[in-house]
């Protein structure tokens, strides 16, 4: 491994504090908890939406979350290892066939729905 990759791995370990980052994929509905500082007050703001893209670039990894708020579409890009992100919770797994779901931008209503991925449980052998 080269020196830059080693430094990136150390920085990722420092930022995550040893905790693993929640696994999610495009199509999943997630709730991103963001630390917001307003003057001297600090609070946590939740942003819930569908992950339409994920960019895996080590320390520079990011993802885009899209939601419909009051009839208006809102997209927000988050850095995966940002200290402003308090947590990521997966609400629902989506079953999609694409890595980038940019086509959802031109769709609304029922045509913008994503099927839910059903996880099969293994049967116990008796």
From Swiss-Prot:
SUPFAM superfamilies linked to this entry: Translation proteins SH3-like domain (SSF50104)
Keyword Ribonucleoprotein: yes
GO cellular component: cytosolic large ribosomal subunit
GO MF entries: structural constituent of ribosome
Keyword Ribonucleoprotein carried by entry: yes
Swiss-Prot/TrEMBL keywords: Ribonucleoprotein, Ribosomal protein
Disulfide bonds: none
Listed Pfam families: Ribosomal_L19
GO biological process: translation
Functional note: This protein is located at the 30S-50S ribosomal subunit interface and may play a role in the structure and function of the aminoacyl-tRNA binding site.
Family under the similarity heading: Belongs to the bacterial ribosomal protein bL19 family.
Annotated protein name in UniProt: Large ribosomal subunit protein bL19
Organism whose genome encodes this protein: Bordetella pertussis (strain Tohama I / ATCC BAA-589 / NCTC 13251)
């Amino acid at each position: 491994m080269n020196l830059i990759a080693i430094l990136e791995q150390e920085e990722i370990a420092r930022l995550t504090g040893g905790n693993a980052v929640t696994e999610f994929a495009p199509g999943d509905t997630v709730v991103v908890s963001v630390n917001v500082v307003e003057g001297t007050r600090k609070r946590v703001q939740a942003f819930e939406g569908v992950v339409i893209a994920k960019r895996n670039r080590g320390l520079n990894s990011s993802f885009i979350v899209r939601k419909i708020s009051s009839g208006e579409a809102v997209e927000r890009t988050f850095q995966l290892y940002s200290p402003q992100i308090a947590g990521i919770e997966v609400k629902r797994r989506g079953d999609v066939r694409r890595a980038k779901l940019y086509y959802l931008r031109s769709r609304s209503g029922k045509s913008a729905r994503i099927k839910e991925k059903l996880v099969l449980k293994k049967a116990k052998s008796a």
